[in-house]
From Swiss-Prot:
Residues 1-47, 492-522, 543-574 are annotated as: Disordered. One of its GO terms (molecular function) is RNA binding. This is Ribonucleoprotein PTB-binding 2. The modification N-acetylalanine is found at residue 2. Interacts with PTBP1 and RAVER1. Keywords: Acetylation, Cytoplasm, Nucleus, Repeat, RNA-binding. It is found in: Nucleus; Cytoplasm. Gene3D superfamilies: 3.30.70.330. Residues 548-569 have a biased composition (Polar residues). May bind single-stranded nucleic acids. InterPro entries: Euk_RNA-bind_prot, Nucleotide-bd_a/b_plait_sf, RAVER2_RRM1, RAVER2_RRM2, RAVER2_RRM3, RBD_domain_sf, RRM_dom.
Length: 691
């Protein structure tokens, strides 16, 4: 048999070499590269093995092939337990036993496949407590076939390769029954399917020397002595522009005529680089493989290896094409991942901004996801998108990024501060009852907000809602509010120090100017905010101030007080660009066509500030409290406040249903204001609480 195979191989080599335009075949027969060899350098032909070594290898392969030691014992009595199964199989070494009473089935693992076969013969159709038992091998779905393994791999090296991905039940290489050498593929069965799936993904395309491994699922019923030898060959490393199927068929018909021979094609076009040839028997395929491996076709030295056994040639070719596609794409998605610059440019699209702001606008769900954004992080600062924003925030002043993008990035950094400020006012007035964790220390909020002292709010706040003098008493001192306003951003169309709109009452007109903003702070933000001239200006109120007051004086007072009292734990805020920290006042970046007013409204807007607006809103009573609760961000940075906010949000299931403004607006909003902030503030103050 060995002599016949050798003669056939020599003739096949000569025939294949002649068809390819080469010399005698024996000199062309390589057996493939080793794991240690350099890529493209084939191993020399392995030396002939001693007959005893060949017999030992084949015996080891047969032992592992039949080493299926897991059995099923079916049709057990309903009340059976593991002890009864142990007593039934007391003559065998049980490694594992589990009884499923619902299925009336026992899952048993014995010492080896020999005991499993013996137990099947002994207890199949065995009568046990009036039931005829059904004993059979357990099916497995964790079996893989690994091809393109270097032929120099030993069984120990192959086991080390596959064991890295999980516990294995068995593994073995397939050896030639003629020469005893490895045929370049093997099988591995894992304990769990998860291990097998991981190994398949990791091994697919893994480079070992000049070979790229290929892993695929296998049917356990194919693990039989007459079925594990493959009839299909893969001709790899063909010229990429090779299209001559007739020539390829002629070359591989010199020794034995194949039943299938085709170049790789994907959707009618040639993939290039490899082909599949199928023969009638495994012996014919082995002879051709030995003769053709390492031959040259059109200047390229091809690699001829065995495919996985069991499937016909056409199915094998389709599986190889699919695997080639996966390896070329490096197991990535169909669409490439966008880089940070592309993400930033997409922020100019209102639809993209709306998607990003969706969690912030809709609030937190009643029951947050187990693996969702941490409670201590705002929705827009979750780990999935923060790297791109952190990277792009460094280059946000570039003209390529656009005005809207820069505004959006700045607002992201201001959201936590706005949450702290609004939550402070809510806890002072609307939260008369102590929280579940007690009252938070005032020093924490003061330090985080950069405010030197507690805002001097009077105790009678909220008892007499309609009195103007109560509202005026809520205005803090000049130094305190100026320090607080150092943390609050403004838009460029707002008045600077000493420029405020006309008052609503004589009482308010008599109040001194307490809030100012340095004009120089707006110089850096002008290019980025010109597209938002009407945004949120009308809803921000400050103590009214006569226009005759000198502008430089107010500027000096404001900037001096802010520099003395800003001692934030988070560091100094950016001074060049100051934007609104309230996410609800920045909706123009999401819906510019709805939020932005006509250009004519620029001249009629009354410029105001946010601190007095919040204080006046608090003095309005219960409805103002509801409005402030809806303005509060739903993911505050501090855990103490997250408790209160979450409890209130659980009671409130309504969405933000915006109604048209009605006549007789509340006192804290100017009747002539046309800005978006005024519109939303009016709506919030009028809405009723919905449970």
């Amino acid at each position: 048999m060995a002599a016949a195979a050798g003669d056939g191989g020599g003739e096949g080599g000569a025939g294949l070499g002649s068809a390819a335009g080469l010399g005698p075949g024996p000199g062309l027969r390589g057996q493939g590269p080793s794991a240690e060899a350099h890529e493209g350098a084939p191993d020399p032909m392995p030396a002939a093995l001693h007959p005893e070594e060949v017999a030992a290898r084949l015996q080891r392969m047969q032992r592992e092939l039949s080493n299926r030691r897991k059995i099923l014992v079916k049709n057990l009595p309903q009340d059976s337990n593991c002890q009864e199964v142990h007593d039934l199989l007391k003559d065998y070494d049980l490694k594992y036993c589990y009884v499923d009473r619902n299925k009336r089935t026992a899952f048993v693992t014995l010492l080896n496949g020999e005991q499993a076969q013996n137990a099947i013969q002994m207890f199949h159709q065995y009568s046990f407590r009036g039931k005829d038992l059904i004993v059979q091998l357990q099916p497995t779905d964790a079996l893989l076939c690994i091809t393109n393994v270097p032929i120099s791999f030993t069984s120990e090296e192959f086991e080390e390769l596959v064991r890295a991905y999980g516990n294995i039940e068995r593994c073995f290489l397939v050896y030639s029954e003629v020469t005893g050498h490895s045929k370049g593929y093997g099988f591995v069965e894992y304990m769990k399917k998860d291990f097998a799936a991981k190994a398949r993904l990791e091994l697919l395309g893994r480079q070992l020397g000049a070979s790229a491994l290929f892993a695929q699922w296998m049917d356990v019923n194919l693990l039989a002595s007459e079925l594990i030898h493959s009839k299909c060959l893969c001709i790899d490393k063909l010229p990429s522009d090779y299209r001559d199927s007739e020539e390829l068929l002629q070359i591989f018909s010199s020794v034995h005529k194949p039943v299938f021979c085709q170049l790789a094609q994907d959707e009618g076009s040639y993939v290039g680089g490899f082909a599949v040839v199928e023969y009638s028997t495994a012996e014919q395929a082995e002879e051709v493989q030995q003769a053709a491996d390492g031959m040259t076709i059109k200047g390229s030295k091809v690699q001829v290896s065995f495919c996985a056994p069991g499937a016909p040639g056409r199915s094998t070719l389709a599986a190889l094409i699919a695997a080639q596609r996966v390896m070329h794409s490096n197991q990535k998605g169909l669409l490439p991942e966008p880089n940070p610059v592309q993400i930033m440019k997409s922020l100019n699209n209102p639809a993209m901004l709306q998607v990003l702001l969706q969690p912030q606008l809709c609030g937190r769900a009643v029951k947050p996801a187990v693996l969702g954004t941490p409670h201590s992080l705002p929705h827009l600062m979750n780990p999935s998108i923060s790297p791109a924003f952190l990277h792009l925030n460094k280059a946000h002043q570039s003209s390529v990024m656009g005005n809207t993008s820069n505004l959006f990035l700045q607002n992201l950094s201001h959201i936590p501060l706005a949450q702290q400020q609004l939550m402070k006012f809510e806890n002072i007035h609307t939260n008369n009852k102590p929280g579940l964790l007690g009252e938070p220390p005032a020093v924490v909020l003061q330090t985080a907000l950069g405010i030197g002292s507690v805002l001097p709010l009077k105790k009678e706040l909220g008892h007499h809602h309609g009195e103007a003098h109560k509202t005026s008493s809520l205005i803090p001192t000049q130094t305190t509010i100026t320090a607080g306003m150092g943390m609050l951003p403004f838009f460029p169309n707002q008045h600077i120090a000493g420029q405020a709109g006309p008052g609503h009452s004589n009482t308010q007109e008599k109040q001194p100017a307490t809030v100012g903003m340095a004009e120089g702070n707006f110089s850096g933000s002008q290019p980025y905010l010109q597209s938002f001239p009407n945004l949120a200006a009308g809803s921000l109120l400050v103590g009214h101030h006569k226009q005759q007051q000198s502008q430089p004086k107010g500027t000096e007072i404001s900037s001096g007080a802010a520099s003395k009292n800003q001692t934030s734990l988070l560091g100094e805020p950016p001074k060049e660009i100051r934007l609104s920290k309230n996410p609800y006042l920045n909706l123009a970046s999401v819906l510019p066509s709805v939020c932005l007013s006509s250009p004519a409204s620029k001249t009629t807007l009354h410029k105001t500030g946010i601190a007095s607006s919040i204080l006046d809103a608090i003095s309005q009573g219960s409805e103002s409290q509801h409005a402030l609760e809806k303005c509060i961000a739903y993911s505050p940075p501090f855990g103490d406040y997250a408790q209160v906010s979450s409890l209130r949000n659980e009671k409130r299931g309504s969405s933000y249903l915006i109604s048209a403004p009605e006549g007789g607006s509340v006192e804290c909003v100017d009747q002539h204001s046309q800005g978006t902030g005024a519109y939303y503030m009016e709506t919030y103050l009028k809405k009723k609480r919905v449970y």
